[in-house]
């Protein structure tokens, strides 16, 4: 449902920031106030923490001896190099080494063309423009070499991200690294270029696929919304609640797809607008799911306290509840992101310059998204169970006594509604469950097949909802009747127009002719000249 990072490792809650925003401060100068000097950049004490692990790649977290790291990327743009400077990756040892047999010259200083926000491109010193990190995102990587192929053209931005020009894919700083390259064996100088993950490990590509999976659901949701708005018989309490629920999902999915597919700048206002829009409508959708659960449960209660309200007033109450609570969550999330004294691992991460959606690499997503949804799903489950128990009790009671035909019909109708929305709840429950599990085990390759199940659930849920709520025999019958009534109404209007035109012609004819008492008006028939029609 969300812009998930299938291949992420979650940081500990007690560290000051995401591992990918840190550098190792071991051996660097420590000041009495707790700050560190990292190659001329002062890292303040509040952005220094102790880590007992490292991320050896985007998918692996390794426990190591405690060491000090600083969140230098929080106040200076970082750029990632695959190996420490003047070292190269050796596949035999699966690590970085100093190759003493290599006589090529390293650039000193390394100069890079950087594109800035004003779209100007400037040649800058890599070491002065960026804080340098050393991290290899994936086991298998390939370097871009624009000297040999225009397909490898790229743009480096001032925030450390990169745009692959060929497929317009914006890649975050922790998903690629800079590497020394050469074109020919005879070349005596290294050139610094980015290296991408191999296609099977290309996390940005995986997220693009997930976006298309979500897009597959959107048309079916829109069709379902249209049917329930156009058919008067479906515009009851449950139908309107379903429409609001689907509107929330549709807008949420559309916002995330736009951000992902159009490579929205993570530092711009557009990123924040779409990120918070998606958050608000997703939360609103789940609140409407709880409304549906409550309304079903309420209809089977012995008392009917809320039934004193008319249906319009009840729908207004439900609307204020669902969208109002979603608005409260939105305000809470936005304020948390703006608090300067709140640790970064507790901030939602929406529009923070890296993400347009929630930061899935720490526990913030649990606080602002998965936690509230978990509470809603648990409450819905309880209400569905209570409703099922009540239905069973009513059935037994009606079997014991002689029930009227109306009572039996009403019970059957409510049971049908319950069964229908129970299936909806199961569809959403499975989707939500796979999302939650993928969040917790995102760095474990053994669970990688679950991600495909989650993508499939995202792709299929709109289609399943359409089949469940539109392709029912009763709804198809209503659609047929609606189309027939529209067609009949059009024919009737055409007939009325023709009749009115004929009457008008006859009236005009009567006005222009002088009536004669002795001599009636005779119109000869065009079919048979012997026959005549007389109008008096």
Curated annotation (Swiss-Prot):
SUPFAM superfamilies: Family A G protein-coupled receptor-like, Methuselah ectodomain. It comes from Drosophila simulans (Fruit fly). Disulfide bonds join 17-71, 73-78, 82-177, 83-96, 138-197. The keyword Cell membrane applies. Keywords: Cell membrane, Disulfide bond, G-protein coupled receptor, Glycoprotein, Membrane, Receptor, Signal, Transducer, Transmembrane, Transmembrane helix. The gene is mth2. GO terms for molecular function: G protein-coupled peptide receptor activity. It comes from the Eukaryota. The chain crosses the membrane at residues 212-232, 242-262, 274-294, 315-335, 366-386, 418-438, 450-470. This is G-protein coupled receptor Mth2. Residues 487-506 are annotated as: Disordered. Residues 233-241, 295-314, 387-417, 471-536 are cytoplasmic.
